[in-house]
């Protein structure tokens, strides 16, 4: 009862082909809905959903469920505008900032499969993730801050794109204040630009065993 279902499952476990088990396989839901919308439906929209507290920059901020859903549903619309649909893959190569959370939940909202790659990872490692995932869009930031240094992401991303055999169709880059970088249109656009004409979108219905994300170990 704690999980929202568009269609409640009648079968809990399919164990006919172990070890490839399927859970709730006839159920239909959405992980973004269960992370955000359900809490708003239950009257908790004004409660805090996300706290950002950076020990490097000292920046602090809080987002309610309503605020976070608004950001997520609009960026989900921005992804749609860039051609991302259900089943498409999106690589998220970002520092630990609120926009990274927004990007992940936005993918879940529209049924896209996200793959988080540690921000600052070497170009060859990022290239291998691009090739393996066959990502349509890469979401990144201009830089990341680590103790005693700034890691410029754009050169790393540019090199990874050159190295990868699979070519992404679009890059969406979040410009960090004071560390803005030049973008090459039309394949590269800023986070803010992607949102300029985007409309908020609702959650798509997902079968329980459809992919949500790719996590490399």
Describe the function of each predicted region.
Residues 1-35, 39, 175:
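Flexible, non-catalytic linker and terminal segments flanking ANL/adenylate-forming cores
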Residues 22, 78-127:
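Conserved AMP-binding/adenylate-forming
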Residues 31-35, 72-75, 103-104:
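Structural preference for long, well-ordered alpha-helical segments in enzyme cores
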Residues 35-64, 174-182, 212-214:
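AMP-dependent adenylate-forming
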Residues 36-40, 68, 72, 90, ...:
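Adenylate-forming
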Residues 46-48, 171-174, 184-216:
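Conserved pre-ATP/AMP-binding loop-to-beta segment of ANL
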Residues 47, 52-79, 196, 200:
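Glycine-rich adenosyl-nucleotide cofactor-binding module
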Residues 109-193:
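Structural core segment of the AMP-binding/adenylate-forming
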């Amino acid at each position: 009862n704690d999980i929202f279902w568009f269609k409640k499952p009648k079968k809990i476990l399919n164990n006919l082909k172990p070890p490839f088990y399927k859970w709730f396989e006839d159920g239909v839901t959405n992980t973004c809905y269960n992370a955000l919308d359900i809490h708003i439906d239950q009257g908790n929209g004004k409660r805090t959903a996300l706290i950002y507290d950076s020990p490097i920059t000292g920046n602090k901020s809080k987002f309610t469920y309503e605020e976070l859903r608004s950001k997520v549903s609009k960026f989900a619309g921005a992804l749609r505008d860039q051609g991302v649909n259900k089943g498409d893959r999106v690589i998220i190569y970002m520092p630990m900032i609120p926009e990274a959370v927004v990007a992940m939940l936005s993918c879940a909202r529209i049924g896209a499969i996200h793959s988080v790659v540690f921000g600052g990872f070497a170009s060859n490692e990022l290239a291998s993730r691009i090739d393996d995932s066959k990502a349509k869009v890469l979401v990144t930031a201009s830089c990341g801050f680590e103790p005693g240094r700034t890691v410029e992401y754009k050169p790393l991303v540019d090199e990874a794109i050159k190295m990868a055999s699979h070519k992404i169709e679009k890059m969406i880059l979040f410009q960090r204040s004071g560390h803005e970088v030049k973008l090459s249109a039309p394949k590269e656009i800023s986070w803010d630009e992607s949102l300029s004409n985007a409309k908020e979108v609702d959650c798509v219905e997902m079968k329980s065993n459809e992919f949500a994300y790719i996590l490399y170990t």
